Amino acid sequence: MTSIPLGPPQPPSLAPQPPHLHGGDSLKRRPDIDNDKEMSAAVIEGNDAVTGHIISTTIGGKNGEPKQTISYMAERVVGTGSFGIVFQAKCLETGESVAIKKVLQDRRYKNRELQLMRLMDHPNVVSLKHCFFSTTTRDELFLNLVMEYVPETLYRVLKHYTSSNQRMPIFYVKLYTYQIFRGLAYIHTAPGVCHRDVKPQNLLVDPLTHQCKLCDFGSAKVLVKGEANISYICSRYYRAPELIFGATEYTSSIDIWSAGCVLAELLLGQPLFPGENSVDQLVEIIKVLGTPTREEIRCMNPNYTDFRFPQIKAHPWHKVFHKRMPPEAIDLASRLLQYSPSLRCTALEACAHPFFNELREPNARLPNGRPLPPLFNFKQELSGASPELINRLIPEHVRRQMNGGFPFQAGP
């Protein structure tokens, strides 16, 4: 499968980001970019064009490290949006391909996406290599995030199957969704980040190894209990019902709902809840889950308990999917797509679900016979997990290979 360029060859015109971007979520005030060590990066002047442009920047120079000049040739635009532009580039010194996300930077504020990406290091989260600032002839300041390049998105992989009237093989559904939940388990527990925009377009896939990675942390935030957040977040088809109800004190379980929608979409070949607007989105959800009870509405947003909704019975999950659907897939979807946020399983519990048991088999391989991408090299996400859950997550053959020496051992 080849990579397809998205969007026009030139960057869209960008308006400066207002301080309230991504919400009643306040951005941190930054008095001076140049004096902020955490944000320090070279500022390159006159960086208007994208495709064909060569960008040189300096990295290193901290803690006695030698300074090093790196040059990138911008090759093609791979994504555009209100945030800015993402382009593929090649490092002229090493030949390595990278993705560079270029966003307009308000000089008064820190960039939250950069701050969060610096915290993260996981096989199922796209990695930040370094960053630099650039200016244009109009004296606009841009932040450039240099990330590993992953050629495909889950959206395009699924489209590859649906355009030829095929279903994605169930093995790949398992492999991709397991890695999505593993990435979510990491960001939810280690840095404590909620992604807030999980969807197939924000899930990268390497077509050779089938490794899957979360990307685009432009909407992400560390959620603090008792602190209000904006509810108008997350792309519509994947938006949790509490967000549609206008909740502002939600939890990272909104990502679990979104991931449940992605799972259902891979199984069905199309979105499960294709609402045309927020109200229609809720109607689509009610058509499957039925009318929420007063208690479920209270769990989503206490201010809505007096609203009257048409009484619709839940559609049985086994009728939502085709007859030959594995019962474990249906069971997992039903545990993820619950009205009450606290009743949705956690990302780590989802990883341990029997739907993924095939991936834990000693002889599990890709259909072409190649080894699976890394699935069991867990990091801090296992801290606080019960021994029973860890035993279900890490297969016995993996424990034997490591002589039980993984960081969070499950006990005897």
UniProtKB/Swiss-Prot annotation:
UniProt-listed Enzyme Commission number(s): 2.7.11.1
Residue positions where Phosphotyrosine is found in the record: 232
Nucleotide-binding is among the record's keywords: yes
Compositionally skewed regions (Pro residues) per UniProt: 1-19
Binding sites annotated in the UniProt record for ATP: 78-86, 101
Positions of modified residues (Phosphoserine): 26, 127, 219, 252, 342
Gene3D superfamilies, A to Z: Phosphorylase Kinase, domain 1, Transferase(Phosphotransferase) domain 1
Enzyme class: transferase
GO biological process, alphabetically ordered: brassinosteroid mediated signaling pathway; protein phosphorylation; regulation of protein localization
InterPro entries: GSK-3, Kinase-like_dom_sf, Prot_kinase_dom, Protein_kinase_ATP_BS, Ser/Thr_kinase_AS, STKc_GSK3
Gene Ontology MF terms: ATP binding; protein serine kinase activity; protein serine/threonine kinase activity
Catalysed reactions listed for this entry: L-seryl-[protein] + ATP = O-phospho-L-seryl-[protein] + ADP + H(+); L-threonyl-[protein] + ATP = O-phospho-L-threonyl-[protein] + ADP + H(+)
The Protein kinase domain, residue ranges: 72-356
Modified residues (Phosphothreonine): 136-137, 293, 346
Assigned keywords, A-Z: ATP-binding, Kinase, Nucleotide-binding, Phosphoprotein, Serine/threonine-protein kinase, Transferase
Active-site residue list: 197
Family: Belongs to the protein kinase superfamily. CMGC Ser/Thr protein kinase family. GSK-3 subfamily.
Described purpose of this protein according to its UniProt entry: May mediate extracellular signals to regulate transcription in differentiating cells.
Subunit note: Binds to KIB1. Interacts with beet curly top virus AL4/C4 and tomato golden mosaic virus AL4/AC4.
Protein name (Swiss-Prot/TrEMBL): Shaggy-related protein kinase zeta
Gene name of the record: ASK6
